[in-house]
Amino acid sequence: MRWEEKDIITEAKKSGFKAIPIFTKDFYSAIGVGENYSELEADVIIQRNTSHARALTTSLIFEGWNYNVVNDATSLFKCGNKLYTLSLLAKHNIKTPRTIVTFSKDKAVDLAKKIGFPAVIKPIEGSWGRMVAKAVDEDILYSFLEYQEYTTSQFRQIYLVQEFVKKPNRDIRIFVMGDEAPVGIYRVNERNWKTNTALGARALPLKIDDELRDLALKVRDIMGGFFLGIDIFEDPERGYLVNEVNGVPEYKNTVRVNNFNVSSYLLNKLREWIKK
């Protein structure tokens, strides 16, 4: 278990909840066979699987057994697929980085010229900045696309290329819990253009203004889900751009720099939700 899962269990005990960890290696679904996890007594299942595929699958199974799951499988699918995320946000007039998606390497390079270089290539699914690369010209972009083609990803021949947003050396992560956006951080990296904390970015406290809060809650309405981490870029000309949405967000550094108890806040919001 990560720090977050341990903290949820600790805070649950303090709040009077009975927290029961469920490990994927022990989990099973026995359809038409007999005893299974569907007999577990629980008001809510908090989805904290580190694997997107396992998170999506276990949420689907628990929902099939009529459990309340946070987050539900539909919102996890929307968040886990970057193309789906961007398409939904664009449909609802939420500003995002300019993006192209093609099934041809040559077409991807040709369209990338309209976005301009440097350009960013990223996988349709993935986290922690893995397989995300910056191409400074056409030749390098083609090489990255060619490399992707020979990976084992199911989306290896779907090419997603984005503009390189000229943001400060930071991005923003806003946490939404239920109908509130109570806390966020700046993720700052002076040595790498990627601002994932998993890649060395520093977390700094963020004061959420009304514009950011309204934007985060609009994204929540579009994506669904109960507990989201929303990643936002600051563009010098276009303002806030929503880059990605995380359906199983990590928050250890957010707690540390803000002195804000995310686990306790989440559990209290879940208590309110269960009582409705």
Curated annotation (Swiss-Prot):
Cofactor(s) listed in the protein's UniProt record: Mg(2+)
Catalysis: reaction(s): [amino-group carrier protein]-C-terminal-L-glutamate + L-2-aminoadipate + ATP = [amino-group carrier protein]-C-terminal-N-(1,4-dicarboxybutan-1-yl)-L-glutamine + ADP + phosphate + H(+)
Xref: Pfam families: RimK (PF08443)
EC class name: ligase
Annotated Mg(2+) 1 binding sites: 231, 244
InterPro entries documented for this protein: ATP-grasp, ATP-grasp_RimK-type, ATP_grasp_subdomain_1, LysX_arch, PreATP-grasp_dom_sf, Rp_bS6_RimK/Lys_biosynth_LsyX
EC number: 6.3.2.43
Note on how the cofactor is bound: Binds 2 magnesium ions per subunit.
Residues that hold ATP according to the record: 82, 122, 126-132, 162-173, 187, 196
Binding site residues for Mg(2+) 2: 244, 246
Molecular function GO labels: ATP binding; coenzyme F420-2 alpha-glutamyl ligase activity; metal ion binding
PANTHER family reported for this sequence: COENZYME GAMMA-F420-2:ALPHA-L-GLUTAMATE LIGASE, RIBOSOMAL PROTEIN S6 MODIFICATION PROTEIN
NCBIfam families in UniProt: LysX_arch, rimK_fam
Oligomeric form and interacting partners: Homodimer.
Role summary: Catalyzes the ATP-dependent formation of a covalent bond between the amino group of alpha-aminoadipate (AAA) and the gamma-carboxyl group of the C-terminal glutamate residue in LysW.
The protein's name in its UniProt record: Alpha-aminoadipate--LysW ligase LysX
